[in-house]
Amino acid sequence: SLSASQQAKYPHLKDAAAFALPSGKDLKPLLKGELVAIGTDADGILQGATLVQSAGALDALYSEAATKLTYGAIVEGGNVTFRLWAPTAKSVKLALFDEQHNAIGERAMTQDEASGSWSVQGGSDLVGKYYRYDIQVYHPVSRKLESYQVTDPYSLSLAMNSEFSQVVDLDDPALKPEGWDSLKAPHSQKNPADITIYEAHVRDLTGNDESTPVEHRGKFLGLTDSDSVPVTHLKSLAKSGVSHLHLLPVFDIATVNEDPAKVANIGDDFSKLCEVNAEVKNSKFASHCGGGETI
């Protein structure tokens, strides 16, 4: 049966049967591929099989060392250290790109057996460059070893549409807003009962506001226009006792194209919608694509 500590961590499994591998078995290489638990009868005839869920094993084997490390593109002491936690990966390479996102090189990364992380170090010339990780990893859906090029889950900066991660130094004065180092929170965060929250949608807050510059509407930049009607309203709320502004959604939305050249909005020619969305040309709206109408 599971130990007391295991039952506490996985209470939904406390009544399940527990099995153990032979002592001395190196589990880490096994977690890089397909793991199947099988049951046989006394004659060794297969009676059943199931795929193994490895999340608990990964935590047990790697978490102590892994949680002591810093991840991402770390700028420190004139060097840039790239570190990614990918214990199940067969191999990881750092793929580098210039400002136009042209490939400029690739560097092999080394895995740390204790933490399961992969890392490689470069010079300060990499600050400002874009990068991705080339990963070879077993995928449980395809049940094959797959190759992927992915952005860094620990990214501090990303290119348009989050297609490339970027190396940035957050201590660089050029990246700090004026007065950033002396900025202090206007309200204490210690007692949640003293917090009064106003919730707002990033787009809706300024999206249709005529006092906000067109190029800032519906964007974070809309909050920087101190004399606009929405921001003036927020200031009045602050004077009335509102202490915190909760913006949402602030995560990356893959279905929203950030490239203005590939976006069609209300008021644009319908033909532009046909250009940016090929499916429209194959729909019942196809006849409108060359009619000079607006959306």
Model-derived features with residue positions:
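Extended low-complexity, serine/threonine- and proline-enriched intrinsically disordered segments
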Residues: S1-L2, V92-L96
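The feature marks proteins involved in alpha-glucan
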Residues: L2-G77, T81, D112-D225
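Surface-exposed loop/edge segments in extracytoplasmic proteins
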Residues: S5, H101-A108
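Short proline/glycine-enriched turn/loop motifs at strand-loop junctions of beta-rich domains
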Residues: W85-S91
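Short, solvent-exposed loop/turn and secondary-structure capping segments
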Residues: L94-F97, R132-D134, S142-V150, N208-P213, ...
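Aromatic- and acidic-residue-enriched carbohydrate-binding clefts of CAZyme catalytic domains
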Residues: S211-D225, N257-I295
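Catalytic domains of carbohydrate-active enzymes, especially glycoside hydrolases
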Residues: V231-V250
